[in-house]
Amino acid sequence: ILSTSPDKEGVIQLDKETIGECMQKSILRYDDSSEHYDTISAFIKSLRGSDATAATYYLARMIDAGEDPKFIARRMVVFASEDIGLAGNGALSLAVATFEAVERVGLPEAKYNLFHCAIALARSQKSREITDLMNEAFALAHKYPNSPVPLHLRNAATKLMKDLGYGKDYKWQAGFQHEKGFLPEEVREESSNR
């Protein structure tokens, strides 16, 4: 700062480069929204690509830039279901525990939790099954929003409802497969064609 010349009014103007030189470390350019989104995108894509080294690099950059650690943890919670899903059911529990640790512990100590989770997510098997089934379910629900629930699946809370066939032939047991299935007929026909 002492080597910086003052302006016409005698004021020394400080910019990022000058401050960075004083701190003897680089300051991450994180001053616009595109850098924020580009970095989190690279982080998530590194997790998806099973590259723990790249994921931790982008994680360190975000932390150094002052990114909200809860934002990072939230993204890992979503990633655990979206990209790992049923291939690693423990991933969601780890990500949620990481979010809670970040909330309770805070930085700088929560860095350990964030890195632990990121490395584990990167090394986990990946599956898009949840995402694919969710998208299919919403597509069917949007196409058939008012298809009536089949009678055998309806709640038979009264004698009249039972007389109308509500809940008929339904058995309450694990793995019970009703001959008419569990979807409205028009939805069942389309879903079996997928």
Task: Pin down the residues of each PLM region.
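Conserved C-terminal helix/linker of AAA+ ATPases
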Residues: 3-28, 70-76, 133-138, 151-152
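Conserved C-terminal "switch" segment of AAA+ ATPases
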Residues: 4-14, 29-33, 83-90, 103-109
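Conserved helicase/translocase motor-coupling segment
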Residues: 16-61, 74
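Terminal-proximal interaction/regulatory segments of ATP-powered molecular machines
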Residues: 49-54, 58-194
